[in-house]
Swiss-Prot record:
Keywords: Apoptosis, Cell cycle, DNA-binding, Mitochondrion, Nucleus, rRNA processing, Transcription, Transcription regulation, Tumor suppressor, Ubl conjugation, Ubl conjugation pathway. Capable of inducing cell cycle arrest in G1 and G2 phases. Acts as a tumor suppressor. Binds to MDM2 and blocks its nucleocytoplasmic shuttling by sequestering it in the nucleolus. This inhibits the oncogenic action of MDM2 by blocking MDM2-induced degradation of p53 and enhancing p53-dependent transactivation and apoptosis. Also induces G2 arrest and apoptosis in a p53-independent manner by preventing the activation of cyclin B1/CDC2 complexes. Binds to BCL6 and down-regulates BCL6-induced transcriptional repression. It comes from Mus musculus (Mouse). InterPro entries: Tumor_suppres_ARF. It is found in: Nucleus, Nucleolus; Nucleus, Nucleoplasm. Disruption phenotype: Mice lacking isoform tumor suppressor ARF of Cdkn2a display delayed mammary gland involution. Residues 54-73 are annotated as: Disordered. Ubiquitinated in normal cells by TRIP12 via the ubiquitin fusion degradation (UFD) pathway, a process that mediates ubiquitination at the N-terminus, regardless of the absence of lysine residues. Ubiquitination leads to its proteasomal degradation. In cancer cells, however, TRIP12 is located in a different cell compartment, preventing ubiquitination and degradation. Changing A120T: No effect on activity. This is Tumor suppressor ARF. Changing R97Q: No effect on activity. It comes from the Eukaryota. Residues 1-63 are annotated as: Interaction with CDK5RAP3 and MDM2. Pfam families: P19Arf_N.
Length: 169
């Protein structure tokens, strides 16, 4: 007695047709308690992976970009630039920040430039911006694919381990 799973991996690359790989994973119930608990943990891991894949992308994205991360208005972009990219809060007194023998802002010292580089993060398309949920669906797909590869390698390892000649009782 045991369980069997059919694991399907779909690989989509740009400019190429969809590739599908199908693996049949069999779990034979073992008499050894440790192996049985490992197999049960592996089955639970597969079921969790299937649940993650079944969820898919978010159903109702917000009014802004495709993943509902932020709104499109330029005023909100300016607010983000002002609050997110604020300069450092100095812990040392001004005398400790001076370079040796010079006063800050005088000729010969490196002047601090706060120009267009300060708001460079807010320019460009919404998908190019950094954020907690930027590119979430792509990250989920990569995570799922890595999980499947890890699981498949683990199954092969356990299968080879169980079939070793010195393990037979």
């Amino acid at each position: 007695m045991g369980r069997r799973f059919l694991v399907t991996v779909r690989i989509q690359r740009a400019g190429r047709p969809l590739q599908e790989r199908v693996f049949l994973v069999k779990f034979v119930r073992s008499r050894r308690p440790r192996t049985a608990s490992c197999a049960l943990a592996f089955v639970n891991m597969l079921l969790r992976l299937e649940r993650i894949l079944r969820r898919g992308p978010h159903r109702n994205p917000g009014p802004g970009d495709d993943d509902g991360q932020r709104s499109r208005s330029s005023s909100s972009a300016q607010l983000r630039c002002r609050f997110e990219l604020r300069g450092p809060h100095y812990l040392l007194p001004p005398g400790a920040r001076r370079s040796a023998g010079r006063l800050p802002g005088h000729a010969g010292g490196a002047a601090r430039v706060r120009g267009s580089a300060g708001c460079a993060r807010c320019l460009g398309s919404p998908a190019a911006r950094l954020g907690p949920r930027a590119g979430t669906s792509r990250h989920r797909a990569i995570f799922a694919f890595r999980w499947v590869l890890f699981v498949f390698r683990w199954v092969v390892f356990v299968y080879r381990w169980e079939r070793r000649p010195d393990r037979r009782a």
